[in-house]
Regions:
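Catalytic loop of the DD-peptidase/beta-lactamase superfamily, centered on the K-T-G motif
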Residues: 1-133
Length: 133
């Protein structure tokens, strides 16, 4: 969490801070991403999604404490690190979603896609529950 691995510094403290600090404005967050309200309780640092409000973020993405950071890959390659829970989760699928502005309508009209889109948050919820977090 602080830029070291096994006592060896690999990132400066400043780099870690910038990566894990939300850099998006309220105006940026007004716009959906991939047809979903991605920014609810989240922001984006340098190349990482960052949980800014766990209460708002949890219903859409599953649990993750304040400061949890992740990579929400558009094609299903997703990971999350929750420093407060000392937990790292990996969820890797390969799926080419509809990336158009009409993505939400495409998902709404396809029950299989709707289930696929909810699989990752279910995975997160079940993992936290199984670990008693």
């Amino acid at each position: 969490g602080d830029g070291t691995i096994d006592g060896v510094r690999v990132l400066s403290p400043e780099s870690v801070r910038l990566m894990r600090t939300d850099r998006l404005s309220d105006e940026h967050k007004r716009h959906n991403f991939l047809g979903a309200p991605f920014w609810v309780g989240r922001g984006f640092g340098l190349n990482l999604s960052v949980v800014t409000d766990p209460v708002q973020s949890t219903p859409l993405f599953g649990p993750g404490g304040l400061g949890t950071f992740s990579w929400p890959g558009a094609y299903g390659t997703w990971w999350q690190a929750d420093p407060g829970a000392d937990l790292i989760l990996l969820y890797l699928i390969q799926h080419c979603p509809d990336l158009s502005v009409n993505a939400a309508a495409a998902v709404a009209g396809n029950p299989g896609l709707a289930k696929l889109r909810t699989a990752q948050p279910r995975f997160v919820r079940r993992t936290y529950r199984a670990l008693g977090l």
